Amino acid sequence: MSALDATQAALAAEHAAVYGYGVVGGRIAPERRAEATAAYEAHRARREVLRRAVRDLGGAPVAAAAAYGLPFRVGDPAGAVRLAAVLEDRVAGVYSDLVRATEGPARREAAAALREAAVRAVRWRGGDVTFPGLAERA
């Protein structure tokens, strides 16, 4: 996978995560709302970084879809927490591809994004995975 393709895939994943956190925010329990808001803002910031990176690589940033399918129905706070963990796992998987496809500063940035997503996933899930970013590949 080229650096441009991997960056576009990461951008698409961030678009989906921003959408997903909109759903999470609507169902999350009040005591976890600040955590959901912080994650939403982190994904928005990463999305902007990736848009610039795509342009720097000579591409046109992939646009966000109007809506995204969710992996399951989110009808209560527990479902919102579960969705947040899934979103982070998916983003981590895409960032693991970006780490493999890039080098230098871009690789360091992708590794930092992978680490941040893995930490958020652990916080949402309450447990970790052996190899963050590879759970989606299993």
Give short role names for the model-derived ranges.
Residues 1-138:
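All-alpha RGS (Regulator of G-protein Signaling) helical domain and cognate RGS-like helical scaffolds
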